[in-house]
């Protein structure tokens, strides 16, 4: 039985999903803002976030909000961390891979998570200590023992393009062991896919906390492990934590092996968490 907070999160995510689907055939009418060279937002991002915030605030008016479009509002000790459209570039091009991500964070740690893919009607949920679920089915991370034959997910952050050479060097080293590496354009779905075993691990630098807050909990509750590029604990999700971070996720053996390649290739040294 889901917690009341998760039920509200699911309702909010599904409402936002309806907003995304209603506009998918009229993308040319959307107003698009270029936040940086490779980072975009649109009317539909804002509309979806407003729908989510309205649902959450109605049920829990005392909780704070950290959203991609609206920033931090209110109480940061207990807050919702929202990405109303993770994979905006995909969405705006009609590429069918994007989602809504919502996490409830208490004292810097995610306690509940929802990731919803409206196109596939796939609903990922997790609560701390209660496991991870995909459409009412318990999920687990893959059980590989090392990097050999793994399917890895990554992203090329628009905020870290100057370090692309280091990431490509890391990718080159990983391809000597992994079966393949995917770059899907949605960090939240990348983590959800690690949680359900569709991918073996995920790594990325310069990723925003709202992109990964829900996915981190999903991976942990699916029996996985999450750390930064140095092998330390993943960052806090509050005003004391960084706005962007570096992340490695998978089962503990694969995550550690991946983190070691990141360090040995020099990619970890290239990342500056203060950027």
Swiss-Prot record:
Residues holding Mg(2+): 68, 83, 85
GO cellular component, one term: cytoplasm
CDD domains cross-referenced by the UniProt entry: IMPase (cd01639)
Catalytic reaction annotation: a myo-inositol phosphate + H2O = myo-inositol + phosphate
Primary location: cytoplasm
UniProt-annotated location(s): Cytoplasm
Keywords tagged on the record: Chaperone, Cytoplasm, Hydrolase, Magnesium, Metal-binding, Ribosome biogenesis, RNA-binding, Transcription, Transcription antitermination, Transcription regulation
Binding positions for substrate per the UniProt entry: 68, 85-88, 182, 211
Needed cofactors: Mg(2+)
Any one Gene Ontology molecular-function term assigned to this protein's record: inositol monophosphate 1-phosphatase activity
Record flagged with keyword Ribosomal protein: no
Database matches in PANTHER family: INOSITOL MONOPHOSPHATASE, INOSITOL-1-MONOPHOSPHATASE-RELATED
Subunit structure: Homodimer. The rRNA transcription and antitermination complex (rrnTAC) consists of RNA polymerase (RNAP), NusA, NusB, NusE (rpsJ), NusG, SubB, ribosomal protein S4, DNA and precursor rRNA; S4 is more flexible than other subunits.
Name of this protein: Nus factor SuhB
Species of origin: Xylella fastidiosa (strain 9a5c)
Record lineage: Bacteria, Pseudomonadati, Pseudomonadota, Gammaproteobacteria, Lysobacterales
